[in-house]
Amino acid sequence: MSKQNWIRLSDISTEAPEGWKEKDTEEKTEKLVKRLGDLQQMLYASGKHAVMVVLQGMDGSGKDGAVHKVFDACRITGLTLTAFKKPTEEEFAHDFLWRVHKAAPQKGMIAIFNRSHYEDILIQRVHGWIDENRVEQRMKAINAFEELLTFDNSTLVIKFYLHISKDEQEKQLRQR
């Protein structure tokens, strides 16, 4: 990916859109959560497709809260949740996508990733543990992996980045 196509999060506001009303959003969210529960039951019953939900965000951005709120009406038998933390020794002994592929959803299931395979680029790049060539190769591998899931397993891959300000992050981390 060329630098001209990069998105700079610092250029994207963390403020709610003008005219936004929290009460309206809560009411809409409640209806959508119920609808998601119905759709999840249909997905599970048909066994023809899978969904992989990827949640990324800084510490304190609300990934855990989003999982609890959004998937509240879903049946636990049709969901898996994987929180990707620092790779274990066993995971380090394999390619960087090994642990992610193990957590990919089977048909009929929704797999929720709290953090994901993107961490294996983001964190290592920030700390200077991998060079730009390795970054490029891993991005290509991730794209190929997601295409494989889509093509071979009829998996819908949905990615969310929960974007908060540094002030909000600090506030959330202090509350822990």
Task: Report the location of each language-model feature.
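Glycine-rich phosphate-binding loop of ATP-dependent small-molecule kinases
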Residues: 1-176
